[in-house]
From Swiss-Prot:
It comes from the Bacteria. It holds the Pfam family Ribosomal_L34. Keywords: Ribonucleoprotein, Ribosomal protein. This is Large ribosomal subunit protein bL34. Belongs to the bacterial ribosomal protein bL34 family. The keyword Ribonucleoprotein applies. The gene is rpmH. One of its GO terms (cellular component) is ribonucleoprotein complex.
Length: 44
């Protein structure tokens, strides 16, 4: 059985990156929530 976690930085950024989050209304909501909570890192 192959490992379920196969690290890939390009996919990581594409799926969970800042620009991806900013591209949708709900993504911006996530960022706003993380800012309000005081997260040091907002996205991947």
């Amino acid at each position: 059985m192959k490992p379920s976690f196969n690290p890939n930085n390009r996919k990581r950024k594409k799926d969970h990156g800042f620009r991806k989050r900013m591209s949708t209304k709900n993504g911006r909501k996530i960022l706003a929530a993380r800012r309000q909570r005081g997260r040091k890192v907002l996205s991947a």
